[in-house]
């Protein structure tokens, strides 16, 4: 989880760490709960603004790629 926290800090993303869970606060658009599993991070959408969903949907794939590559480097 340290690499994920480092990534969040480097990208000016607010986060809340609680045990094995990290909640990423991505502006007013996304709030993502990240749970570290054995071989990957699992994400759960907590909040999603549908009005911007079409324009920013690729961000989900980007976040997922970053999280999983971060875990592989750990």
Q: Each PLM stretch: what is its role?
A:
Residues 1-25, 46-64, 71:
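Negatively charged, low-complexity tracts enriched in Asp/Glu with abundant Ser/Thr
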Residues 28-39, 43:
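A short, structured beta-strand/loop element
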Residues 32-34, 52, 66:
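Extended aliphatic helical segments
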């Amino acid at each position: 989880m340290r690499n994920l926290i480092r990534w969040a800090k480097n990208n000016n993303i607010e986060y809340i760490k609680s045990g094995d869970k990290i909640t990423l606060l991505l502006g007013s658009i996304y709030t993502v709960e990240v749970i570290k599993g054995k071989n990957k991070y699992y994400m759960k959408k907590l909040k999603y603004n549908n009005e911007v969903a079409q324009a920013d949907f690729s961000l989900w794939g980007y976040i997922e790629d970053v999280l999983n590559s971060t875990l592989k480097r750990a």
